[in-house]
Amino acid sequence: MKIPLSNRLLACCGFIKPGERVADIGCDHGYLGIYLLTKGIARSVIASDINQGPLASAVRNSEKYGVRNQISFHLSDGVNNIPRDFDVLVCAGMGGDTMVSILSNAPWLKQDRYRLILQCQSKTPMLRQYLSQNGWQIAQEVVLKDGKFLYTVMAVIWKPSEALSPGECYFPSALLENEHLSAYYKWVITGLETIVNNQKEQANPFAVQALDELRKREQT
């Protein structure tokens, strides 16, 4: 049986290393974990969701695909109620502000034994800024297209280093070259220009700095 996995979730799976123990936060119907297990990629999966309905659906789906005994299910707000015996944590389909809240409430994740795979639906620059200011480093990030929209998936490690500049928060050097990168850059620039031009004197200084930095980068 084919597992109905979006391009976004497939991209997340692409960052999982063989044999890793995976925690899927906000698992929805559980397809990411099911895919990783049926493909022999993950060793085990922890699946959590804040709502009982999706979690019950994920349990049924795991039974349907024959991997129920390899997944532990947990009703949890973020990572508050999950076991800590995993290697990589996946958060997909949430806003950047929600991810910031989850990570802020889990200081125990700040260890080099954990990796994060994050896929934002919105407010990605906010998430990148938070990560870089709180000891996390984006090791790699990839742009993908799902339907009509462009998204990114980032692989994050615990490695305190210099905070990202405003321009890097919008278009980081960790982005991998692929067929969608140019379109993503144009989308970022257009969005920044809209913010700056519409707000004029009241424009967010961070956005102004980011746009100026990226334009200067074009000239080098």
Task: Report residues per predicted region.
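Short SAM/SAH-binding signature in class I
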Residues: F86-G93
